[in-house]
Amino acid sequence: MALNNFLFAQCACYFLAFLFSFVVVVPLSENGHDFRGRCLLFTEGMWLSANLTVQERERFTVQEWGPPAACRFSLLASLLSLLLAAAHAWRTLFFLCKGHEGSFFSAFLNLLVSAFVVFLVFIASTIVSVGFTMWCDTITEKGTVPHSCEELQDIDLELGVDNSAFYDQFAIAQFGLWASWLAWLAITTLAFLKVYHNYRQEDLLDSLIHEKELLLARPSPRTSFQEEKSAVI
């Protein structure tokens, strides 16, 4: 019963990780298509007036687009999380239906993979959160523009890209990444508990085997008495 509960908890966490990763992959892919391969994360720019003698902001000009690697890394990390979560969810569901428990090596390998994904998704989440905050600070000039970052997606910035949904896309991606990170953190915790439990069982088994060997090697009192009697005769 305890094994089934543990496997069910693992399966639920893998399903959540799969779901949240899917929530990330879709908007990031759409944004890459809308921005024609350009990355808005960490983008630098400013508002310029058509007539420099008039202090009126009219058009946003990009000085330097963000590094494409930032968006690609976040998308690839989400895809990896999606595929691994799907594979492990299917495997755990199979064990749950069969009532089978994996070996100590598979549990340890699962712990290493989960810890790696936690680290990877955390980096991707940080990149998206920090990069998108910098983009919003740039296009709103840290709040001096009379429009919020969310409102500016409804205004054509004339950048040669489709910016009609960038805020929604990255808001959803941020939520999905951090939620996915929490799901993988729970998976890693469960994997660690599994490895620790298996280690304790192995240690207990070794202890029992050792005690059995000592008991078998120790002569019984009757045997000792007969040996002493034979020695006296």
Swiss-Prot record:
Entry similarity comment: Belongs to the TMEM179 family.
Membrane-spanning intervals of the chain: 6-26, 75-95, 104-124, 170-190
Subcellular compartments: Membrane
Gene Ontology CC terms, in alphabetical order: membrane
Keyword Transmembrane appears in the UniProt entry: yes
Alphabetically ordered keywords of this record: Glycoprotein, Membrane, Transmembrane, Transmembrane helix
Native organism taxonomy: Eukaryota, Metazoa, Chordata, Craniata, Vertebrata
Xref: InterPro entries: TMEM179 (IPR029673)
Glycosylation sites per record: 51
Protein name in UniProt: Transmembrane protein 179
PANTHER family: TRANSMEMBRANE PROTEIN 179
Membrane-topology descriptor: Multi-pass membrane protein
